[in-house]
Amino acid sequence: MALPTIAIVGRPNVGKSTLFNRIAGERISIVEDVEGVTRDRIYATANWLNRKFSIIDTGGIDDVDAPFMEQIKHQAEIAMDEADVIVFVVSGKEGITDADEYVARMLYKTHKPIILAVNKVDNPEMRNEIFDFYALGLGDPFPVSSVHGIGTGDVLDAIVENLPNEEVVENPDMIKFSLIGRPNVGKSSLINAILGEERVIASPVAGTTRDAIDTVFTDSEGQEFTMIDTAGMRKSGKVYENTEKYSVMRAMRAIDRSDVVLMVLNAEEGIREYDKRIAGFAHEAGKGIVIVVNKWDTLEKDNHTMKDWEEDIRDQFQYLSYAPIIFVSALTKQRLHKLPDMIKQISQSQNTRIPSAVLNDVIMDAIAINPTPTDKGKRLKIFYATQVATKPPTFVIFVNEEELMHFSYLRFLENQIRKAFVFEGTPIHLIARKRK
């Protein structure tokens, strides 16, 4: 089920991103320094008082004719429309400005719970300044210093108090997947074709409060799927154009809710930076991935076309070497019947557990093939390994010194584990930890 969503809004330079980072915590750290892995942190997941929620950072809004301001307002309006709770950030150092009043007028129209966070209240003497912000008519102001972490707990308490009631727990065996990709790659046609191919009765299921329609269906073997809709909001009746900022934001939300992501490419247009950016986020989030090349029927092909495409994909998505590639046509339904089985196989891979004894046999065999590296005369020693999580499969390798585990050797061990076990379509995480 969709997580509740919190939007952080305000004029430029009031510290929205600092507050966002403070709330998001470690979630926003970059896991892998790999080209194409997203660095865009407009969206993250946080947890407070055992309530999990999504947070969206937005650009600074101002009532001026500045470059890109219309796009920024547009993105912020979308975020506010999606949000269950809105955090309005202002600056205690500067007091109420015309831009603050402009944003406040936007917020009046949302009829959503508003948390007024007066940021940059960095010392106790400034706390009296917050009373001026009652004039905005948005309730009690919360004094905050995002830089020092002062007052953020009070803001989080207020957020949790205003979250919608928790939803019923979903069927744990259900596989959730989404189709992501640039506008016009044919996601909607693929969704319709997949549902038609399954010949099932599709039932729309509303999300928590945003009316983002998911579709639940069952295949011929009785496996239940939830297809997560990324087509946008319908609640307000508004139609939003596909600005990149918005499509990135909703793709991130869909990825976060998914077990498996179908990364859809357009055979007519090739691979773009947007594709790599979104695929990088799915990889970093540890999701199962299938690379789906749609509109395959539109290309003039020879015996090398598919091979050339595969080589190009592997070259441009090097960090997705584990992801299967399938060439399909939503129009002719070419190969679409294979997708549900691929999704099920990847879901099984994500949930695979390897007994420690078997895993350590593979590790020892790997060391025999390629001995552990040395650094300044000191050799890496691997004592044992164990699996600590699934979705994605995560392994901790206990060593004498963590810094002796070079990235290249960790990658070698990953490749050996992949050769020994079926982990198609899912990333696996290996973590070196010093044995105590």
UniProtKB/Swiss-Prot annotation:
Name the residues that bind GTP 1. Answer: 10-17, 57-61, 119-122
**UniProt-listed InterPro entries:** G_ENGA, GTP-bd, GTPase_Der, KH_dom-like, KH_dom-like_a/b, P-loop_NTPase, Small_GTP-bd
Residues that hold GTP 2 according to the record: 181-188, 229-233, 294-297
Supply the alphabetized keyword list. Answer: GTP-binding, Nucleotide-binding, Repeat, Ribosome biogenesis
The family database entries (SUPFAM superfamilies) matched by this protein are listed as: P-loop containing nucleoside triphosphate hydrolases (SSF52540)
One GO molecular function term of this record is: GTP binding
Which parts of the sequence belong to the EngA-type G domain? 4-167, 175-351
The record places domain KH-like at 352-436
* GO biological process entries: ribosome biogenesis
Superkingdom, natural source: Bacteria
**Cross-referenced PROSITE patterns:** G_ENGA
| Cited function | GTPase that plays an essential role in the late steps of ribosome biogenesis.
Provide the family line.
Belongs to the TRAFAC class TrmE-Era-EngA-EngB-Septin-like GTPase superfamily. EngA (Der) GTPase family.
Subunit (UniProt): Associates with the 50S ribosomal subunit.
Which PANTHER family did the record assign? Answer: GTPASE DER (PTHR43834:SF6)
Protein's name according to its UniProt entry: GTPase Der
